[in-house]
């Protein structure tokens, strides 16, 4: 190995377990569109997608065209939905690579229709309805007129109708009421499309939280993301899901040294030893995605014992107070995220809490310079 002993192990057996949890949570016959955008939330979307395809996943969701093309070029032939839609000039590749795309304006629909007609193909689209997210989508009040126009575009295949919950991960009364209102608006839009003779193959609004927490009988597809990777949508789901983290970010102790009382550690001297302390230097830092916000807040696992990050997180290094770790030695494994060999875990939810963010950002932030090593693949 020419780099460092800092790697991210990806346990595909844990991915299979989490996928099975989704299967058990949704009604029989409901499809699963796995969200693999942003490099499968930092887990490596090629290997993740191949594993999910072997499990019989219905489809994949990506953010933009290039991600969809990468899946096709890697041999993935399941349906792939571009959740963010295509931009002007991308329509030909979208159709040519047999990718489906979200559509949220008539201009998008018209250009896709014209492009597909010239290619003697059908463009597969999912009409996105804005039911309350306020980000992308046809306004629900404008949906009937949109669908009427769509009926005249003969080179489009209405593969789906889609929306997105804004607060399905919030299980308080206000969050539930808003999600229920979104679901009702979406159901009405779907009914309006069908009353006009349109027959979408897929109807979907449920993300990870809604897949586990809501009854949506008019839908036949769910879109899990974060739960596949072993983290909860929010703290409201604590104890409600039997998930396993699939990423283990690990490194090793590179140096040990005793420091005397009053010794400062790292940039800006944000930590000063209160007494004689044993400090370990570990080759991982914010350039690897171990956030600087974890300065004097993070914890790691060494020999099954939790030990605190002390001093400012550097670009390439962190320092750990290992005074209380029995027998600690240079070369010992350090678990920064995920579970160690004894089953003790530092959860993404914990890192997110310490860093003032969410597990999604923790996963997505693990940088490309950290090699991914895949374990327990089925093929």
Curated annotation (Swiss-Prot):
Matching Gene3D superfamilies: Alanine racemase (3.20.20.10), Lyase, Ornithine Decarboxylase, Chain A, domain 1 (2.40.37.10)
UniProt GO molecular function: alanine racemase activity; pyridoxal phosphate binding
InterPro entries recorded: Ala_racemase, Ala_racemase/Decarboxylase_C, Ala_racemase_C, Ala_racemase_N, Ala_racemase_pyridoxalP-BS, PLP-binding_barrel
Gene: alr
Active site residues of this protein: 37 (proton acceptor), 267 (proton acceptor)
The keyword rRNA-binding belongs to this UniProt entry's keyword annotation: no
Enzyme class: isomerase
Cofactor: pyridoxal 5'-phosphate
Any one GO cellular component localisation term in the record: cytosol
Xref: Pfam families: Ala_racemase_C, Ala_racemase_N
Binding positions (substrate): 135, 315
Keyword Metal-binding assigned: no
N6-(pyridoxal phosphate)lysine modified-residue sites: 37
A GO BP entry: D-alanine biosynthetic process
Record protein name field: Alanine racemase
Role according to the record: Catalyzes the interconversion of L-alanine and D-alanine. May also act on other amino acids.
